[in-house]
């Protein structure tokens, strides 16, 4: 049975976009929500009350177990994709794919405003 997945983030692309795209590509069902929808309170309240591991988003709830850090989330959701060769079996090719992922993460630091667009302009 597939786990119940809740991806918790703000309504922007940024750090949750890779997980969203991977889940969509894999045809994996999940619920996208914000802190209000998942915890019943706004981000700052969730943060100050200790509901957020490391005090930040995104989070992925897997059957209620919270996973933090976008890289960890991305690698977990990639492991759920059943399409052939999505994660290379060759260790060098897998490392190259992971390096590409890390490079994409670096881009968020140098062009943050691009990651706020959520629709075609």
Which residues does each predicted region cover?
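GST-like domain detector, emphasizing the conserved glutathione-binding G-site
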Residues: 1-121
């Amino acid at each position: 049975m597939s786990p119940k997945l809740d991806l918790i983030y703000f309504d922007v692309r940024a750090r949750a976009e890779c997980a969203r795209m991977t889940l969509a590509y894999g045809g994996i069902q999940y619920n996208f929500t914000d802190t209000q929808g998942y915890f019943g309170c706004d981000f700052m309240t969730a943060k100050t009350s200790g509901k957020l591991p490391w005090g930040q988003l995104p989070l992925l709830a897997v059957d209620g177990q919270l996973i933090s850090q976008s890289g960890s989330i991305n690698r977990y959701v990639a492991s759920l994709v059943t399409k052939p060769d999505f994660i290379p079996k060759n260790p060098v090719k897998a490392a190259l794919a992971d390096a590409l992922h890390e490079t994409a993460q670096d881009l968020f630091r140098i062009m943050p405003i691009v990651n706020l667009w959520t629709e075609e302009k």
